[in-house]
Amino acid sequence: MARSLRKGPFIDEHLIKKVLVAQEKNDRKPIKTWSRRSVVVPEMIGLTIAVHNGRVHVPVSINENMIGHKLGEFAITRTFKGHSGDRKV
């Protein structure tokens, strides 16, 4: 079920504060966050946000195509090693 339009997009308060400070200072170093549930908003365009994937922080450069998606979509959590029987010639 989609989120109600009257509520607006969800973004953690601590993350939006860091984004606004980075924009004010024109700071380009990555913003570390564990908030995979936060939605990408237009204020984040051009910033690099390091999203935690359970092990490390994955740097994600935000562009206009990412608006409306959640940060967790861009930091893969599972590593695929391949199927064991794929060695057929």
UniProtKB/Swiss-Prot annotation:
SUPFAM superfamilies: Ribosomal protein S19 (SSF54570). The keyword DNA repair does not apply. The gene is rpsS. Belongs to the universal ribosomal protein uS19 family. One of its GO terms (biological process) is ribosomal small subunit assembly. The keyword Transcription does not apply. Keywords: Ribonucleoprotein, Ribosomal protein, RNA-binding, rRNA-binding. Protein S19 forms a complex with S13 that binds strongly to the 16S ribosomal RNA. One of its GO terms (cellular component) is cytoplasm. One of its GO terms (molecular function) is structural constituent of ribosome. Coiled coil: none annotated. This is Small ribosomal subunit protein uS19.
